Amino acid sequence: MTATLSLYNASVPGLIRMMDNLEHILRMGQTNAEDRGIDPSVFLTARLAPDMLGLVGQVQVATSIAKACPFRLAGTTPPVYDDQDNASFDDLYALIERTRSDISSVTREQIDGREAVEFNVKMGPVERSFTGISYSSGFTIPNVYFHITTVYNILRHNGVPLGKLDFFGGPSALG
């Protein structure tokens, strides 16, 4: 059987994988905080620069963008989460699990064939126009990677011994 690259294949499996990787990075951070006797809030509120979101905010944005993608590609409204309760590592794991579940709920049949379908997304005060493929490959995937990389960098900057393989979900994730 020959695999083909479809809009579904280019988005949904990778987004789920990115959520798995994000969870791995956070678990490394939580374990490191426990091992070093550091209050978890030190990591959860840390940021790379004063004008950037802290770790919790980075996770919230990564999950928000990731979960919206398949719904927008399918032409449906993405679920909205109440991000007020994300104050612990366990809260972030629950957010990631909910995101994975919502991403997985959109089917291949709902997405494939919609590569050229045009739609608008309101981003703050501005509305942007996309096609399915430009939204997935030009907006969603780069943004999710950016915010997950920032989580990785925040933890790394705070002494968590993360390596490149951890970004990909750990050594066992690559097979």
Question: Predicted regions span which residues?
Answer:
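Conserved alpha-helical segments that form or flank metal/cofactor-binding pockets of metalloenzymes
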Residues: 51-79, 99-107
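C-terminal end-helix/capping segment
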Residues: 156-175
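Long amphipathic alpha-helical coiled-coil segments
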Residues: 75-87, 157-163
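Alpha-helical scaffold segments that form or flank carboxylate-/histidine-based iron centers
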Residues: 3-17, 39-64, 82-92, 124-143, ...
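Structural signal for well-ordered, non-membrane alpha-helices
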Residues: 19, 23-30, 67-70, 97-104, ...
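Short secondary-structure junction/hinge motifs that connect adjacent elements
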Residues: 30-50, 114-121
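Acidic/histidine-rich alpha-helical segments that form the ligand environment
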Residues: 85-123, 128-155
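Surface-exposed helix-capping loop/turn segments at secondary-structure junctions
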Residues: 29-36, 106-113, 157-162
